Regions:
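Acidic, polar-rich N-terminal leader regions of halophilic archaeal proteins
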Residues: 1-196
Length: 196
């Protein structure tokens, strides 16, 4: 028996309660699925770093904007990507799995990974400027974001062999490798000397 979703896909994941989202995630109908959860976890990580940025030096800047503004924007972007992932999965399960849908099933996790990469960079800057007990919250946010990043790359790499466009696959794989190096560096910089 297929259990109906508590809320239709037209209701954004940003508007669902945590409990509703988790119930939907555990239910039989797909979506939401792993990619949607990955984007939501990335948004949670961004939120923790954003909260700490509010306590840190207001001058913490990343790429010409405040870390807090960048983190807020990426939090919102990740929630939009959660919705995009749910739509892609819905289309794939509905049997509309053509080349364009398969590319979207790669493009959405790539966008999640890119957003998580931005969170990692901004969160790392926040850790450098924050002090006191709130630093631990930013580091926890980075651990969550790193998990979401790695899950997004796993999804991307799992889906990559499904596309026929070799240049798309090669360019996407290269971008993923570059992101991985950048995120690893930012994470290590932020967590240097942190147990865990």
């Amino acid at each position: 028996m297929i259990t109906p979703r508590a809320l239709p896909l037209s209701v954004s994941h940003g508007d669902r309660t945590v409990g509703t989202f988790l119930t939907e995630l555990a239910a039989k109908p797909v979506p939401p699925a792993g990619g949607t959860a990955t984007a939501v976890v990335g948004a949670v990580g961004a939120s923790l770093c954003e909260m700490v940025a509010r306590h840190a030096d207001a001058a913490v800047r990343v790429d010409g904007t405040t870390a807090r503004e960048l983190l807020a924007a990426r939090r919102e972007r990740l929630l939009v990507l959660a919705d995009a992932d749910a739509a892609v999965v819905d289309a794939l399960f509905a049997g509309d799995g053509g080349e364009q849908e398969r590319k979207r099933a790669i493009g959405v996790p790539l966008a999640v990974a890119e957003a998580c990469g931005d969170v990692m960079e901004a969160g790392s800057a926040v850790v450098d400027h924050a002090d006191g007990p709130v630093v631990a919250d930013a580091v926890m946010g980075l651990f969550l974001t790193r998990g979401a990043f790695r899950a997004a790359l796993f999804t991307l790499r799992t889906n990559l062999p499904t596309v026929d466009d070799e240049s798309f696959a090669a360019e996407t794989a290269q971008r993923a490798t570059e992101l991985e190096a950048s995120v690893t560096t930012a994470f290590e910089r932020a967590t240097d000397g942190v147990d865990g």
